[in-house]
Amino acid sequence: MHTMWKGTISFGLVNIPVKMHAATENKDVKLRQLHKECKTPIKYEKVCPVCDRKVEEDEIVRAYEYTKNKFVVVEDDDLKEIQKEQGDKAVEIIDFVKLEEIDPIYFDKSYYLSPNEGGLKAYSLLRTALEETGKIGVAKMMIRSKERLAVIRFYENTLVVETIHYPDEVRAVQDVPNVPEKGEVVKKELD
């Protein structure tokens, strides 16, 4: 299994070296677009709509759109500094809670964690503690320059880290259209 990230699980004075592996894989069939005549894959070019010309990689910068069509450019050095400040290779456990305390709507992606060199004993201790207490670790971690919330839990003899959404990323259920009121079901229809 391919290692996609190496770092540490940390809480208190404990640091456990780990490797992270994707727990799922996409099995969707991907169709390519081809030129009908010669069956060659279509190429996509990056074009500036204002200058009306193709843009090379070295001419492209990343930016945050803070309001419609208003941007602040974010340099690579800025992102590296943020990563350095926030511990880009650490999964920092900030609390331990019961799994039932986090609604499944918050869960996003799952990754397996395996012990890295020198971490076997501490990994085993954390795994056993989570299994026996039925608790999960709520953590902060950096993935691709973005701080994420996550949980670490016991799963089939291994540790799994699952990224979770921040509360403001989950849409309000009140915004779902055409949901009937709760009292619209007759009790005997349920029997």
Where are these regions (language model features)?
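Boundary segments of small protein-protein interaction reader/adaptor domains
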Residues: 1-191
